[in-house]
Amino acid sequence: MLNIYDMVFLSPIGTIGISIINDKVHELKFINNLKESKSKDSFHKDLSRQLDLYFKKKLNVFDVPYDLRGTQYQINVLKKVAKIKYGSTQSYSDIAIKADSHARPVGNACRNNPIQLLIPCHRVVGKNNIGGFSGENVKKNGNMMFIKKSLLEIEG
């Protein structure tokens, strides 16, 4: 499926595609091969400013409205993930206990997170390793794992 992004932000660790509907972030994902777009209005400019500050280690809480989508279970899990503080991590099992669930479904909810960074699934790790990111398994060690490691390092 081809996504059309309202805004593209070039971060130091990867390109971010952002969809905005009714002044709420609808999707924010690391995507390869997108060209930067200029901020269109005050909402776009503020989001761009916050992203820039985050990557400069000068912002640790985003203050932009977003539209959290998914199944009721996914939304429940992602709301718990949203509470993980900057610089902290929790295991899939930790989140599962809070959601009265199991680690694997928590991982699936994180894999389908439509708004990376704002809902910080990169802060959810395995008990014995860093865990996956955006559907990429830790063993693959590809682009998404580079992004997860980089985000955790930024927040270090």
Predicted regions mapped to residue ranges:
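Nucleic acid-binding interface residues in structured DNA/RNA-binding domains
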Residues: 3, 7, 62-156
